Structure formats: C-alpha cells, structure tokens
C-alpha cells in the first residue's frame, strides 16, 4: 500500500518495484514472501509504516543484512514526535509532513540517512531544487485553511449538494483540491 508516485520514483532510478503482500493483522510485509522474492538483483526493501502502526523492523533489518539490501522505511504515517525517530538499523528513514498528514507542516520532509556519503550525495542533489517562496506557502496555507473549514459536516453537506447541482464530479473535484503531488512529471525540478 503506497502512492503510485513511489513506484515512479523507484523506476526513475533504474529499479523495478516488486510489490509484496502485507499481513492484514500486522500491516507488515509477509517475511516468507520476501524470502521467496529476493534475488541477487534485489537492492532495496521499502517498508511503509501504515495507519500510524510502527512495524517491528528487526526481522526485516536481519533479512536485509543477510541479503545485502538497503532498508528504507517510509514513516510518513508513523510520525509521533519524540516517540519514534526511525529504526536504528534502517539505512534511510523518511518522514513527510504533507497537508493530509496527522502532523503537518503543509509540506516538507525529513530524511535520516545512516551512510554519510549517501546523505551528502542526496544533499547535493537537493540543493539544485528550487526553493518555495513565502507566497507559495501563504497560498498553500490559505487553501488548506478553507479546505479544513469546508470539511465541517454542516458545510460539507451543502457543498456536496451544490457540486451535484452544478453537475460537477464530486469525487474528482475533491481529489483535485486535496492532491498532495503535482500533476505531470513528478521528477521535473
């Protein structure tokens, strides 16, 4: 379970994403399936902590160490302040603070990287990305203030009825208004 843009990012690095079923009880990848799917070409195991559940990563860290695979954890849904800074054996721990996260900054992220050379390389790449302006952030703040206000049940019901009256596709209109990633090429700087 992840957003489709993650697969796009993986492919952009010349890698092939291989999805693995998760256990319905633990929302963790099934280790026995990983054992079946691993090959000499396997490079990275990406585990997403879903719905605020922090998956015990030690068995996956052991699996990655045994198979010489990087362990990357997506902590976007598991940020809990000082309670969890990522697993100590994860090679990369990613935390994002988008508008729909439980702990939001309306954007931005933190990456904890064990390997200092990899961290430096990532920092060098990040430096060429354009910096968002204060105006961009103000527009975003205004947009999500109104979305939050309009999500109040009494107003939401009226808005849905108005959208139907105007023959607007309710689902696609809401999706477009709350889109976390830009449309088009995600990897264009």
What are these regions (language model features)?
Residues 79-82, 92-107, 112-189:
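Active-site region of PLP-dependent enzymes
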Residues 67, 89-90:
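A short helix-to-beta-strand connector/capping loop
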Residues 1-82:
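PLP-dependent aminotransferase-like
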């Amino acid at each position: 379970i992840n957003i489709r843009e993650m697969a796009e990012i993986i492919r952009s690095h010349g890698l092939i994403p291989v999805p693995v079923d998760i256990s319905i009880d633990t929302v963790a990848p099934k280790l026995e399936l990983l054992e079946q799917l691993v090959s000499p070409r396997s490079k990275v195991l990406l585990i997403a902590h879903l719905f605020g559940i922090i998956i015990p990563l030690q068995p996956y860290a052991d699996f990655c160490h045994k198979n010489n695979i990087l362990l990357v954890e997506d902590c976007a849904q598991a940020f809990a302040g000082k309670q969890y800074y990522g697993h100590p054996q994860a090679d990369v721990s990613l935390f994002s603070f988008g508008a729909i996260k439980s702990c939001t900054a309306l954007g931005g992220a933190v990456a904890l990287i064990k390997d200092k050379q990899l961290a430096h390389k990532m920092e060098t790449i990040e430096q060429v990305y354009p910096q968002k302006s204060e105006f961009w952030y103000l527009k975003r703040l205004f947009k999500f203030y109104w979305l939050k206000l309009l999500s109040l049940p009494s107003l939401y019901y009226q808005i849905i009825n108005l959208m139907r009256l105007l023959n607007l596709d309710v689902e696609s209109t809401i999706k477009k208004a709350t889109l976390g990633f830009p449309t088009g090429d995600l990897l264009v700087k």
